């Protein structure tokens, strides 16, 4: 399974460009149009990202086309000029964790993004667009804030949490067919 993220953010596109894509691209339509086995759309005021998993590689242009088509914007000649970024496999996982923790936000440390990721996950899950790969990835993401709160209370928890996270990463890598990664 190929895990990937394709998106636009405040780092790569101005507000007007981001708004063209934020209007409601649904994960189900991306599944149908681009051939993804799983898809989730995370749209915030500063980013629009598609997290997906597929048997064969889905191109960045295919995702851009789906986003443009779903937002009823003419896509002739636009996808080549748009500043999309793409992360695959472990880079995708690292990017998601940076985004959700607020490290990739316009205001570093922003906490709202994790809630937006949870809503995007619930929406995609309800529509049937989340499968086992994205389910494990996002559920692994959602346990981190609870662990962080416990770490602040006791230094011993830090060691257990690091060991637990290391074990989770190894299991996720092995079961997803993704090479081991660390961040």
Role assignments for model-derived ranges:
Residues 1-105:
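A glycine-rich (often HGG/GG-containing) alpha/beta subdomain
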Residues 79-178:
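Glycine/serine-rich phosphate-binding loop and adjoining beta1-alpha1 elements at the start
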Residues 179-183:
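Conserved class I S-adenosyl-L-methionine
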